[in-house]
Amino acid sequence: MTRVKRGYIARRRRNRIRLFASGFKGSHSKQFRAAKQQKQRALISAKGDRIKRKRAFRRLWIARINAAVRFYGVSYSKFVHCMYKNQLPLNRKTLAQMATLHNPCFSTISQKIVA
């Protein structure tokens, strides 16, 4: 059987992984096998952390809305219940932004919903 010279293809594949792992510590950035394993772990962690970030932002928005709504003597859960009952489905992100940045606008909306 004749010898197959892989040429630049294998080198390009390894370099791509090494470039991805260039900021990793120790052998994880130097040795190909360790870098390959670390890249897989990094991508898995990145996926999980994107999901956790969504969860954390939702909790933050709810906390901000709750703090703003309690000023009017209503809890967050009652506020959301009244909001859906009045068929005004604003998402939590916009409500939290209104509560922090546009307080007069949020107060008119909350008074209409609660009343």
From Swiss-Prot:
PROSITE patterns: RIBOSOMAL_L20 (PS00937). GO terms for molecular function: rRNA binding; structural constituent of ribosome. Its main location: plastid. One of its GO terms (cellular component) is ribosome. Keywords: Chloroplast, Plastid, Ribonucleoprotein, Ribosomal protein, RNA-binding, rRNA-binding. InterPro entries: Ribosomal_bL20 (IPR005813), RIBOSOMAL_L20_CS (IPR049946), Ribosomal_protein_bL20_C (IPR035566). It is found in: Plastid, Chloroplast. GO terms for biological process: ribosomal large subunit assembly; translation. It comes from the Eukaryota. It holds the Pfam family Ribosomal_L20. Transmembrane segments: none annotated. Belongs to the bacterial ribosomal protein bL20 family. Binds directly to 23S ribosomal RNA and is necessary for the in vitro assembly process of the 50S ribosomal subunit. It is not involved in the protein synthesizing functions of that subunit. This is Large ribosomal subunit protein bL20c. The gene is rpl20.
